Amino acid sequence: MVNNPSKWAFVTAGVILAAIVAGMLLIRWRGVETNITAKTTSVGLIFVGKKDDASFCQAHYDALMGIKDELNLRVVCREKIPEGAACVAAIESLIADEGCKVVITASFGYGKHLVEVAKRHPGVCFIHPTGNMKRANLTSCMGRMYQARYLSGIVAGMRSASGKIGFVGAFPYPEVVRGINAFALGARSVAPGAQVYVRYSFSWVDDAAAQAASEALLAAHPDIDVFAMHVNSLMPNRVAASWGIWSVGYNKDNARSFPDSYLTACEWVWGPYYRQKILSWLRGKFHGDIDWIGLDGGIVRLSALTKNVAPGTQAAVDAAERRFASRGFDVFYGPVVDNVGVMRVPKGESMSDEEMLNRFSWYVEGVTVEK
């Protein structure tokens, strides 16, 4: 074979040209990213509790702190803002007084007031975690926490010797109801006779109310030996530790605070989601939506199992996670029967996202709600 110098010169020139173009595109891309973050963006965050609550509020605060330097953010918090008209004044203050161009309203009850505020401020990006409303400058996000709840139910069901499990919920909202149901289904998948007893505290953050609900459950059912919860209070974990029973946490992993009683936690991981949404706003590519993100999207997860779990628990959780990953299974695939014997989801069918998100008002078999 005879070499063709002109051919190879042409190929070499082509490679060099391609490299130059790629380099120019990379420089241009980096320039865009640098330009949109060169100016500090003020981000407002309001929630019903405190930023250091070791629970729901801190999960949001820590998420923003984790991306603050990369995106050149100034984070302004408004703590202990009630779910009601008072939130409007707090949001308006973040915009008018603090110059916030992104506002995150981290509680479900803010939603009914948020749409009107978003209409008045089209130049501001609004992000509503756990919400269910949208417009051009407003996006809501609900993680499929019920999937992590199902996994935590497996952990609780395998740990419970009595088959009696307590659950303290904040409000009978669809978000809380579907979590209780998923937890019960997970528990009963490994302990078919398991019973879940629920009491509502009617507050996200009131420690006294969470403690009263926890102690009332134990007074009524002294053989409860595992607690779980959907409140932004660590009180159910504290009560469990003081009574010498096990507990499952929520929002953040607090295993270090309860080394002898904690099993695992259903965690929120907001950082990557906030990063993506804030960048899309800065790039001018933001679209209001209602995002449903599951275990596969990384916004929810089950924290590492502690030394307190029953033998074989990790294998059972891993098997359930593989079922989720296969997309051939989700928690509310039929058959699902409610706690009065009515077939709610027939075999071969599944609940719609809309029903799970907005209209979940019944409880599955094995759940008893205490008055």
Question: Residue spans of the language-model regions?
Answer:
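Periplasmic-binding protein-like
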Residues: G99-S107, I127-P129, H221-S233, V248-Y250
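Hydrophobic alpha-helical segments within soluble ligand-binding/sensing domains
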Residues: C141-K164, C266-K285
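Flexible loop/hinge segments that line or gate small-molecule binding clefts
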Residues: K119-G143, K252-D260
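Extracellular/periplasmic Venus flytrap/periplasmic-binding protein
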Residues: E175-I224, M229
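An alpha-beta-alpha
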Residues: L64, L151-V198, I290-A310
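Extracytoplasmic "Venus flytrap"
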Residues: V43-A63, I67-E70, V76-A85, F108, ...
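Extracellular/periplasmic periplasmic-binding protein-like sensory domains
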Residues: A240-Q314
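Segments of small-molecule ligand-sensing domains
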Residues: F286-K371
